[in-house]
């Protein structure tokens, strides 16, 4: 099991009385829109890595939705190193240029790439095309040209879900509403930063309480264990100061990055409080049944005397409330004691232990369910030349199929 700083109780999933559905509150259309990058990023711009948002037009969205991968012609003249000898000038001239329908978007993307240093990583409103990196020459999310971006976006199932099913399993905000809201789609271009995946963390917030935290990368990292209390303190303070009272919804999931020297917390993403969000080292049933950490609970009874534990750096501080005319009963005291005994002091911070079976998955391919045959993968891992050669052959095959189809149609007339 993944490592946590407290003993993990027997999973509720082992019960014979399992619920047929996870006990999520209804996920509304507005909650999904609030978790869209274009909605929350302007509010937290100073907390996020440098990025630019490009509003997308209907023709460009139609291009992303269309079957097949047809890329605009490159402006640069191919060289011998490009291994594009499978293309002839005539064949290149015959290929349609899809960007003629959205020239302004195409130009804006080229300009933005240059402004952000020449290398960016793309995403749409909610998802990044991480499942399509096998199509990229570099096998990652780095993009240097608009065509690099288009290839990733059009090859990604995650992007298709953003476009086709953004409100899957959602309910209207108003019970009598029968329509779904329009989505203002945006292309997000983020300046490329070589993130250390071991320092990315997913944080779960329920009713404006930071409930639990875990690694995003599911490998074991020895150095994280001595840092756990420092990282938890940083994340708690970041949440309390920046997100707790400013995000529109009380429950959500956010991702952060805390690079050395572990002083600054970067907000990477905000995700819905919904089953579609990966709970990673937890299960959703476990999260939904967790009790709030008592160290960050707020006391509403100002007139009653209480003792509260609060998180302050790496220490536990006792806060005593004044009592004026307190007449709480023994039953109430016993109930409060029971809550304190059963509840954790701080948000659980779960890390992967050395002896976890999944602790050494460095070579395990991610998103394998979204990938294509071995020949395509082999081409993608052989460098820029291999993928370019494969794309050239692919275009040849498509052209021959189209020619044969035209011939068959003529013969049948």
Swiss-Prot record:
One of its GO terms (cellular component) is cytoplasm. This is Translation initiation factor eIF2 assembly protein. ATP binds at residues 123, 126, 128, 130, 190-191, 200, 202, 216, 255, 269, 271. GO terms for molecular function: ATP binding; magnesium ion binding; protein folding chaperone. The keyword Signal does not apply. Its main location: cytoplasm. It comes from Aspergillus oryzae (strain ATCC 42149 / RIB 40). Keywords: ATP-binding, Chaperone, Cytoplasm, Magnesium, Metal-binding, Nucleotide-binding. It is found in: Cytoplasm. ATP-dependent protein-folding chaperone for the eIF2 complex. Binds to the gamma subunit of the eIF2 complex which allows the subunit to assemble with the alpha and beta subunits. Belongs to the CDC123 family. PANTHER family: CELL DIVISION CYCLE PROTEIN 123 HOMOLOG (PTHR15323:SF6), D123 PROTEIN (PTHR15323). Residues 79-101, 327-343 have a biased composition (Acidic residues). Residues 1-23, 71-101, 322-343 are annotated as: Disordered. InterPro entries: CDC123 (IPR009772). GO terms for biological process: eukaryotic translation initiation factor 2 complex assembly. Mg(2+) binds at residues 269, 271.
């Amino acid at each position: 099991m993944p490592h946590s700083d407290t003993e993990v109780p027997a999973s509720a999933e082992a019960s014979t009385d399992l619920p047929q559905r996870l006990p999520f509150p209804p996920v509304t259309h507005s909650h999904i829109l609030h978790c869209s990058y274009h909605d929350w990023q302007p509010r937290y711009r100073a907390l996020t890595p440098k990025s630019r948002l490009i509003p997308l037009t209907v023709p460009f969205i139609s291009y992303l939705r269309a079957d097949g991968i047809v890329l605009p012609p490159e402006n640069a003249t191919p060289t011998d190193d490009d291994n594009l000898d499978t293309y002839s000038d005539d064949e290149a001239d015959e290929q349609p240029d899809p960007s003629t329908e959205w020239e302004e978007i195409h130009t804006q993307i080229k300009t933005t790439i240059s402004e952000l240093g020449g290398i960016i990583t793309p995403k749409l409103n909610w998802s990044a095309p991480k499942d399509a990196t096998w199509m990229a020459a570099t096998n990652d999310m780095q993009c240097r040209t608009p065509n690099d971006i288009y290839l990733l976006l059009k090859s990604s199932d995650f992007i298709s879900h953003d476009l086709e099913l953004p409100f899957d399993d959602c309910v209207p905000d108003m019970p009598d509403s029968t329509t779904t809201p329009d989505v203002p789609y945006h292309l997000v271009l983020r300046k490329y930063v070589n993130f250390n995946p071991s320092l990315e963390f997913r944080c779960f917030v329920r009713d404006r309480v930071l409930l639990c935290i875990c690694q995003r990368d599911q490998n074991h990292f020895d150095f994280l264990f001595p840092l756990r209390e420092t990282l938890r303190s940083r994340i708690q303070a970041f949440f309390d100061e920046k997100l707790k009272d400013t995000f529109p919804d009380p429950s959500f999931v956010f991702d952060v990055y805390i690079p050395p020297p572990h002083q600054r917390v970067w907000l990477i993403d905000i995700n819905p409080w919904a089953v579609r969000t990966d709970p990673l080292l937890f299960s959703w049933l476990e999260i939904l049944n967790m009790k709030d950490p008592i160290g960050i609970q707020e006391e509403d009874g100002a007139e009653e005397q209480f003792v509260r534990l609060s998180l302050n750096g790496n220490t536990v501080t006792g806060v005593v409330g004044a009592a004026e005319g307190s007449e709480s009963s023994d039953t109430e005291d016993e109930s409060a004691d029971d809550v304190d005994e059963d509840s954790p002091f701080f948000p659980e911070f779960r890390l992967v232990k050395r002896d976890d079976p999944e602790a050494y998955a460095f070579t395990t391919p991610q998103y394998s369910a979204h990938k294509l045959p071995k020949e395509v993968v082999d081409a993608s891992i052989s460098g820029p030349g291999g993928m370019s050669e494969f794309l050239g052959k692919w275009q040849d095959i498509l052209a021959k199929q189209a020619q044969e189809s035209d011939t068959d149609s003529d013969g049948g007339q």
